[in-house]
Amino acid sequence: MKNTMKVLTAMLAILLLSLNLSAFAQSAEKSYTIGIAQFAEHPSLDNCREGFIQGLAEAGFVEGENVTFITQNAQADMGLTQQIAAQMAQECDLVCAIATPMAQAAFNACMDQGVPVVYTAVSDPTGAMLADADGKNAKAITGSCDLLPVEAQLKLIRAFLPGATKIGILYTTSETNSESQLKLYQQHAAAYGFEIVPAGISTGADLSLALDSLLPNVDCLTNLTDNTVVSYLAVMLDKANAAGKPVFGSEIEQVKNGCVASEGVEYIALGKQTGALAAQVLGGTFAGEIPFVSSQGGEMTYNSQVAAALHITIPEAEQARGMDVAQK
C-alpha cells in the first residue's frame, strides 16, 4: 500500500510539473499587444518609455518577436488622454500609462475591460487613488513611483546658493502629483533655511505670466515632476536666465538642457523597473497583488557651463560627488 501511494504521489508530481511547464511554454509563445500611453512629450517621460521597452526586453518580451507596441502621446491634452485610454482598453492586453493623468485615465478605462495597467512616472500613487496605503490595489493595476528626493534637493540648493532664502516653485493645479510634491517642499524647507514661494498655473499658456510675477520675488526656481511645467522648460529657462536666477531640475535631462543641477530621478532606470513589473503581469501574476515600486535614486548632476554663466561657484564637495553634464 505504501509503495502504491509513493508511485501515485510521484505520478501526480510529474503531472503537475508537466502542466506548469506547458503553461509556461504557452505564455512564452504567446504574442502580446501592449499599449504605451504617454501623457506629454518631454525628456523625462520619453526616457520612461524607452526604459519600459528595455525592461520588457530584458525579461524576454521583445518587440517584433512576441510583443507589438501601440504608442500614443496625448500632448498634455486631457480630452485626448481619455480617448487614448479608452481606445487602448479595447485593443491591448496590457497598458503602460506614463504620468499621473494618463495613469488615472487608463485605470478608469481599463478596469471594466479586465485589461491590466502598469503605470510609471506617478509621484503619489496613493494620493492619485491608484494604490492603497499598503501599496497594493484590489484591481489590476501596479506601477512605479517617481517621488522626488526633496530633502536632498534642498540640501543641494543650499550648497550651491549659501545666501538664498526663497525658492520659487511653479506647479499645475490640476496635477495631484505636483500638489503632493509641493507640500513636501513646504514641510521641509524651513529646516534648510528656505521659504517656498509657489505659483499655480492651469495650462502652459499661463506659465510666462506666472514667471514674470514669481522671478522678482525668489532667489531661484526648482522643478517638480510637473508635466505641464517641464514641457515648457525652454520658456522657463529663457526668463530665469534673463533675470539671473538659476533653475534646479528634477532629473538629468533638464540639467543637460540648461538647469544648473539636480538630485532628481533617473527615468530610464524607472522605466526599466516598470518593464519588469509588466513582465510579471504578462507571466500570470495579478497586477493588484504587486505593490508599486519607488525610484531607486539617481546620481547628482550639474551643469558647469550654466553655473559659470550665472556666476555660481560649485563647491568642491559637490563636484566630487556629482556628474558634470555640460556640453563641452
PLM features per residue range, with description:
Residues 3-8, 26-328:
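Short hydrophobic alpha-helices and adjacent helix-cap/hinge residues
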Residues 21-25:
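Juxtamembrane cytosolic interface motif at the C-terminal end of transmembrane helices
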Residues 10-20:
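Bacterial N-terminal signal peptides
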